[in-house]
Curated annotation (Swiss-Prot):
Residues 38-89, 138-157 are annotated as: Disordered. It comes from the Viruses. Phosphorylated. GO terms for cellular component: host cell nucleus. Signal peptide: none annotated. It comes from Human herpesvirus 1 (strain 17) (HHV-1). Residues 38-50 have a biased composition (Polar residues). It is found in: Host nucleus. Keywords: Host nucleus, Phosphoprotein. This is Nuclear phosphoprotein UL3. Belongs to the alphaherpesvirinae HHV-1 UL3 family.
Length: 235
């Protein structure tokens, strides 16, 4: 088990008295043992302490530490080349996913309508895939939302709220390319006149900045079937 790092308070407590203990002294107090360094010809005397710590050098990524406890191998990441188009793996009442898309927009009017449109489009166009799509969530800054009428002088505007809005789509890695392409299509096919964004100077512009970020999980993510849009024909 890896021990936590020593806090600055405990390390610096001896300043002005016994002095700051060395890293080797701290490791020795934890029970670490050290071999006496043997500087052979051609080996620099500045060899790092890790080279002389018993059990610190790993002979092979597939072998345990010499003289130390065995460690379980790190679980490999999901393969991005899986081609099965069936429903995702199920674990009882849960459905397993490994890829997440985040669709976000900032300071945009009509953003809820846009994310609702994306959700409906994915439900219809990707009906043969099992996916999960969250409802719209919003985050705002510390700027005040409500102001008294006449609180701002004429010619000035209220501070920006910096409100952002996100939605999340989960799917299998094998279906990520289809989901990514469908997100691009539905975002680009929107009617620009229906959506507006607030620029930094306060003016409204007929455009919607929409950002799509993709994440891959090294471990399966499980959602209950009641929260998943199951593939057509899936039980």
């Amino acid at each position: 088990m890896v021990k936590p790092l020593v806090s600055y308070g405990s390390v610096m407590s001896g300043v002005g008295g016994e002095g700051v203990p060395s890293a080797l002294a701290i490791l020795a107090s934890w029970g670490w043992t050290f071999d006496t360094p043997n500087h052979e010809s051609g080996i620099s005397p500045d060899t790092t302490p890790a080279d002389s710590i018993r059990g610190a050098a790993v002979a092979s990524p597939d072998q345990p530490l010499h003289g130390g406890p065995e460690r379980e191998a790190t679980a490999p990441s999901f393969s991005p080349t899986r081609a099965d188009d069936g429903p995702p793996c199920t674990d009882g009442p849960y459905v397993t996913f490994d890829t997440l898309f985040m669709v976000s927009s900032i300071d945009e009017l009509g953003r809820r309508q846009l994310t609702d449109t994306i959700r409906k489009d994915l439900r219809l166009s990707l009906a043969k895939f099992s996916i999960a799509c969250t409802k719209t969530s919003s985050f705002s800054g510390n700027a005040p939302r409500h102001h008294r009428r006449g609180a701002f002088q004429r010619g000035t505007r209220a501070p920006r709220s910096n409100k952002s809005l996100q939605m999340f789509v989960l799917c299998k890695r094998a279906h990520a390319a289809r989901v990514r392409e469908q997100l691009r299509v539905v975002i680009q096919s929107r009617k620009p006149r229906k959506y507006y964004t607030r620029s930094s100077d306060g003016r409204l512009c007929p455009a919607v900045p929409v950002f799509v970020h993709e994440f891959v999980s090294s471990e399966p993510m499980r959602l209950h079937r009641d929260n998943v849009m199951l593939a057509s024909g899936a039980e």
